[in-house]
């Protein structure tokens, strides 16, 4: 039943994603982070105290998320096993973000194909932290491909990995870790101290999923008839061409698979950030590379699901 729950949840994400106004735990986690952050900032003012407060905030948010998830699942199962199973499916469904990511990428792609650069810049600004107001079409394409490649890890592969390790409650706890990093894990002055622990622990949580993405995306590239060998080669060669210890694994794999170059300089919060290039520019990046990257994401996520199911069946059976 557990394996079936995984498959149904994955299919639900693939088919419908997160409907608008649907009750979503990530919103509740975000509200908890905001409330906890306000308390920390009220009592902590020095960098040292903010770092300690940030660590406490991380423990509270991740601990509460895991405990509530476990408690809700246990209570639902006590009411009726089938009800518990449905709640488990819902929890797993909410931690997967494949359809949401694909739709967000398509929202940028459509106006770009229609020649509406202003609209594509605006839609892009909803999913990236960089300044999009002056981006040219090639830069918009690059930003979308990078976003899909990077979020293939923390939106799909990592949640499935933690689901495999500890069931729906641990997958929910990972989502809290990832949301903390998204909200406070920045390097600029406002968040550097309070978000230090969140940023570093998110890096640690994604160590294995990021490296798995290199292998899975390389296999996906071969299955999609892109360049699987170059995905493997560039993914390894350029794996450290990023300030994050994890992001370049998936981005470099996609760059190699498609024969394009990612990375480079970008503007964040009014500051120019110089980043190393990832991949080799065998050709210029195009709007079609957005669709290709989405395809790679779906194939890699299918492979991840199959891998974790196979390992679980080998270890404990299909129950």
From Swiss-Prot:
UniProt-listed GO biological process terms: cobalamin biosynthetic process
Protein name from the UniProt record: Cobalamin biosynthesis protein CobD
Pfam families: CobD_Cbib
Family, as annotated: Belongs to the CobD/CbiB family.
Segments passing through the bilayer: 55-75, 78-98, 153-173, 296-316
GO MF term set: ABC-type vitamin B12 transporter activity; threonine-phosphate decarboxylase activity
S-S pairs: none
Pathway membership, UniProt: Cofactor biosynthesis; adenosylcobalamin biosynthesis
Database matches in InterPro entries: Cobalamin_biosynth_CobD/CbiB
Function, as annotated: Converts cobyric acid to cobinamide by the addition of aminopropanol on the F carboxylic group.
Xref: PANTHER family: COBALAMIN BIOSYNTHESIS PROTEIN CBIB (PTHR34308:SF1)
Cellular compartment(s): Cell membrane
GO cellular component, one term: plasma membrane
UniProt topology in membrane: Multi-pass membrane protein
Chief location: membrane
Entry keyword set: Cell membrane, Cobalamin biosynthesis, Membrane, Transmembrane, Transmembrane helix
Signal peptide: none
